[in-house]
Amino acid sequence: MSTVSSDPAHAKKSRNSRKALKQKNEIVESSPVSDKGKETKSFEKDLMEMQAMLEKMKIEKEKTEDLLKEKDEILRKKEVEQEKLKTELKKLQKMKEFKPNMTFAFSQSLAQTEEEKKGKKKKKDCAETKRPSTPYILWCKDNWNEVKKQNPEADFKETSNILGAKWKGISAEEKKPYEEKYQADKEAYLQVITKEKREREAMKLLDDEQKQKTAMELLDQYLHFVQEAEHDNKKKAKKIKDPLKPKQPISAYLIYANERRAALKGENKSVIEVAKMAGEEWKNLSEEKKAPYDQMAKKNKEIYLQEMEGYKRTKEEEAMSQKKEEEEFMKLHKQEALQLLKKKEKTDNIIKKTKETAKNKKKNENVDPNKPKKPTSSYFLFCKDARKSVLEEHPGINNSTVTAHISLKWMELGEEEKQVYNSKAAELMEAYKKEVEEYNKTKTSS
């Protein structure tokens, strides 16, 4: 009995357990549905990302298309410009050659620079062109060995320090011979170097100015040439005839034709008919009738030859005078260049002096105003006299050209004429020396 009663209970338990299993199975079956939801969400996300990427690609494509269009437009414009240039080049090739009517100093300046470069190498070897040693260095050369004997263990720096200390303790009388030697060496050095250097710098300044002027002149000439070429339009440029040149004499036939032209024109005939009739008449004319016309032509030829001789002489004289003018012009230009350099040197000296005055202000304050001033030189005395005449000869010129003209006049002045100014300068110098002596006496007595 117990076995029977236990079976249904066991069966119920087993059923309950089956139901529980079904519930588990339901839970297991419900999990794939949730996974599908997640998958759809991720797919939508991917789709959105893909759409965004496509939009970006579309925008980039549009941008690249725009860039390509711009590049195509630039290329098209360049092609149009090239075509224009080709046509302009063809026009220029057809045009006559541009020949500037001016002389250029570029080749000359280049040659000068080449010579200067060669000259520099030679000058380096010369002892005269070496910079003079200062009084201190000259003294060091004389006393180096003595200091070395006294201090054999001292190196270069220590030796130079000892010499520097000794130099400071030396009196002015002991320094004087070294200073005098330095001044003499300096004068010799400046005589060798200064003239060439100053002229070179002056010519460089002038060369820069001339380059600017020639560039402007060249531009004006080229613009004028282009206008003429456009105006001519493939026609050959007519030669400019000299109005002063004698005209060639006409032949005996032309003299006869000119006489007959008036009579034949009165018959209401054309120019060609008149020329034909005059030619036939001249052919049929006898030698006796032709003779007076031949004599007239011969006389005209003789007059023409005489006039041509005179014309050639005047042309030669003009060429000679032009050559002289060019030489004078070159001299004047050189003087102008030197004046420019002097101005530059003056400005440099002013800058130096301002620096020196700042240092030596105390010394300058103690300078006596009653001390006699040095007299002007013979050249400056000449300048005072020549300035008026130069301004009268060349009105409206600037100061630099005035000084250039004056310096040229001084250079061309004879020794006798220069002696007048030299003697005046000497008199002024003697008077100055006397004034200095008197000034020194009064200073010592006070």
Curated annotation (Swiss-Prot):
Which InterPro entries has this protein been placed in?
A: HMG_box_dom, HMG_box_dom_sf, HMGB6/HMGB13
Q: What SMART domains does the annotation carry? A: HMG
Q: Which residues bind DNA?
A: 129-197, 246-312, 372-440
- Which keywords does the record carry? DNA-binding, Nucleus, Repeat
Q: Does the keyword Nucleus apply?
A: yes
Disulfide bond annotation, renumbered to this chain: none
Q: Does the keyword Nucleus apply?
A: yes
Q: Where is the composition biased (Basic and acidic residues)?
A: 349-371
Q: What GO terms fall under cellular component here?
A: nucleus
Its protein name is High mobility group B protein 13
Organism of origin: Arabidopsis thaliana
